[in-house]
């Protein structure tokens, strides 16, 4: 256990991509990855941190390709929303198997499968120490799950949005294509926009900026990274308002 008993954050919104759940698989959900993530989230709960969770659906369905082939975008986005519900069901089950209380809420009504999203109920569940998984995005087409993460983060008054990725944070360039790309440890919202750094889509990012919601980008595949972020240790990239 860490010698520092106090986490840096009281309530967080953790955003996981659907691709993160597929691990080395090309599609679907890798059970080992799912269970590891559930254990890491359990650590946060044991530290007394309130955790809201948004998971993408890209491991199960991507509407963009089908939209190019002629599918109606609204239909494709509705299918994507259902993919996030499937991931949410898998994560809720993994958390329950790890003896973590979790509730799955959906922005669209799916009676008998999960609860409908109600703001006051979500707050109540978080205060009770339960992990609340927000699924089905915002419930509207044309909005990404990053937008959903920022929206729910603002609604639940999270201290930060933790965006889990496959890289160590935000780089000056694509680290896969450019080996000279440098990791940025701290950025202002304006710097991200001016330098056109890839953090999340513009609608999601400006929503966070306009409501002064900090974003920390980190590598979820790095063992212990999530805990280090929560304990306030230098990990990944912090994006926030930087006073001049």
Curated annotation (Swiss-Prot):
One of its GO terms (cellular component) is cytosol. Keywords: Allosteric enzyme, ATP-binding, Cytoplasm, Kinase, Nucleotide-binding, Pyrimidine biosynthesis, Transferase. It is found in: Cytoplasm. GO terms for molecular function: ATP binding; UMP kinase activity. Pfam families: AA_kinase. Allosterically activated by GTP. Inhibited by UTP. It catalyses: UMP + ATP = UDP + ADP. Residues 23-28 are annotated as: Involved in allosteric activation by GTP. It is an enzyme of class 2 (transferase). GO terms for biological process: 'de novo' CTP biosynthetic process; UDP biosynthetic process. Its main location: cytoplasm. CDD domains: AAK_UMPK-PyrH-Ec (cd04254). UMP binds at residues 57, 77, 138-145. Pathway: Pyrimidine metabolism; CTP biosynthesis via de novo pathway; UDP from UMP (UMPK route): step 1/1. InterPro entries: AceGlu_kinase-like_sf (IPR036393), Asp/Glu/Uridylate_kinase (IPR001048), Uridylate_kinase (IPR011817), Uridylate_kinase_bac (IPR015963). Its EC number is 2.7.4.22. The keyword Kinase applies. ATP binds at residues 15-18, 58, 62, 165, 171, 174. Homohexamer. Catalyzes the reversible phosphorylation of UMP to UDP. Belongs to the UMP kinase family. This is Uridylate kinase. It comes from Aeromonas hydrophila subsp. hydrophila (strain ATCC 7966 / DSM 30187 / BCRC 13018 / CCUG 14551 / JCM 1027 / KCTC 2358 / NCIMB 9240 / NCTC 8049).
